[in-house]
A protein has these predicted regions:
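Short hydrophobic secondary-structure edge segments in sensory/regulatory modules of signaling proteins
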Residues: 26-28, 36, 143-146
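C-terminal helix caps at helix-to-loop junctions of PAS-family sensory domains
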Residues: 21-24, 32, 139-140
């Protein structure tokens, strides 16, 4: 599956969509732990990425503790998406402590598998909803737009801008 497939899956698959704008970090990892296939905005920020698309380009090396923990989880978690609470190092925990995470091994229609890891506690500054929505569409290669609960236009991916009738976000003021 391509990165754009996972961007769409992040908002279209109910198992991931529930986490898309959450203030808690969430990551969908490859089975071997080498890549984050999808992340919400808070999860991308945790790894220093501007958005999920940027994080999807990163490869985690063999010495990375996140990679090793995810690979171990993939072997231990039951197939079928049953959620299990795990205490993991990193994943938002303070240095030297463990974070309680909801973990599940997900299966997709194409036969692929991935590990969903969601931190159960927020650490540090809570990212405002408007910023989470903006980062959700930022960097997406597929047409996506984000709106606040009150209908306010927040942002759109580059691919969506021609469909919305403006060339850059400066033009959006006439739409709002």
């Amino acid at each position: 599956m391509t990165s754009s497939d996972f961007q769409l899956r992040g908002v279209g698959d109910p198992r991931l969509a529930v986490h898309a704008t959450s203030p808690l970090p969430a990551w969908l990892w490859s089975i071997d732990g080498t890549r984050v296939l999808w992340a919400n905005a808070v999860g991308a920020r945790f790894f220093g990425a501007a958005n999920a698309a940027a994080l999807a380009q990163k490869t985690f090396g063999p010495a990375d503790s996140h990679r090793r923990q995810v690979a171990q989880l993939a072997r231990r978690l039951p197939a079928g998406g049953a959620i299990r609470l795990e205490r993991l190092r990193g994943f938002g925990a303070a240095l030297g402590t463990l974070m309680t995470c909801a973990c599940a091994r997900l299966e997709f229609a194409d036969g692929g598998h991935a590990v969903l890891v969601t931190a159960m506690n927020a650490t540090g500054r809570i990212m405002p909803l408007v910023e989470r929505l903006h980062r959700l569409v930022e960097g997406a290669v597929v047409p996506m737009a984000a709106f606040a609960p009150d209908g306010l236009f927040i942002g759109a991916s580059e691919a969506a801008r021609p469909l919305l009738g403006f060339r850059d976000l400066g033009d959006r003021k006439s739409v709002v």
